[in-house]
Amino acid sequence: MLMEIAELGFLAAELSHGVRYSLIPGILKAVEGGVLRISSVHNFCPVPLGVSRPSPNCYLFSDPHPEMRRVAVRHTLETLEFAARVHAPAVVLHLGHGGPDGITPRLERAYHAGKLYARSSTRLKVAAVAQRRRDFPQIYGRVRECLDALVPAATQRGIRLGFEIREDYAEFPDEIEMDRLLDDYGPAVAGYWHDFGHAARKEFLGWHDHAATFARRVAQGRLLGCHIHDCSPPDHDHRAVGDGEIDFARLVPLIPPEAIRVLELSPRVGRDDVIKSKAIWSSFAATSA
């Protein structure tokens, strides 16, 4: 797997939440042999034993049950240990669920029906934001309990935690909640992880201005890394670069040179489109240099 990635011209790769324990010996051999570097590891990695299919949300830091939060922390500690073994500088985290359930599918249906900006959709969004503000102290208390248990282990290993922007408003954090997280966890410990497709999906549903959000995080000096893929409205993400509607030519010049860049395409994207995506992205980066 890593050899094939290297043959495509990549110098580093992210290990995703789809890596199973059976793959670890081969990965360690490839890394130790200098096949390529590991840029980052996505929680949970390797896939926790007993989990039937890869899922970064199989355990949640926001879970109302303390025992399940402890399980989430335990498996994240395993991810941190694995990240240290492959010399990865960052671990990307999903932080949990904030609610309300089902809001994104409802808004996507409204989008397709041409009713995204109808009063009914606006009322739905206002109610969702009000619920999140009301529930924030409780949800954030749970998430912070977990993060506080992880920070010492990450710091000891020289690993920074990446707080990923999510595509579904029901997931935690939203953009305002992200501000609080970044205030409470400084740049030596954690950073913002920008996912271009996720941010685009939120923009398509009217939650924020993608470019403004990205520019603000960069200006704050908090961009740790990014997942790169294109997106067509309202929810067709993980497409090859150039096949969607994201204005990469506008956004790429904002990326600082130290930020981690990961091409995160759907498994359905073919080899030729992977090569094309790499070439297009590289051309934007060269223009911005």
Regions found by a protein language model. Give the residues of each.
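Short, basic/glycine-rich phosphate-binding loops at helix/coil junctions
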Residues: 56, 121-127, 227-232
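Generic enzyme active-site microenvironment
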Residues: 12, 40, 162-164, 193-194, ...
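Active-site acidic/histidine proton-transfer and metal-coordination neighborhood
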Residues: 61-191
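Active-site loop/turn elements of alpha/beta-hydrolase fold enzymes
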Residues: 17, 43, 95-96, 166, ...
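Positions that flank functional sites
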Residues: 20, 46, 98, 169, ...
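Histidine-acidic metal/acid-base catalytic patches
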Residues: 1-6, 21, 26, 32-34, ...
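Short acidic/His/Gly/Ser-rich catalytic and metal-binding motifs that mark active-site loops
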Residues: 47-54, 100-103, 235
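N-terminal pre-domain/capping segments
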Residues: 1-88, 110-120, 140, 148, ...
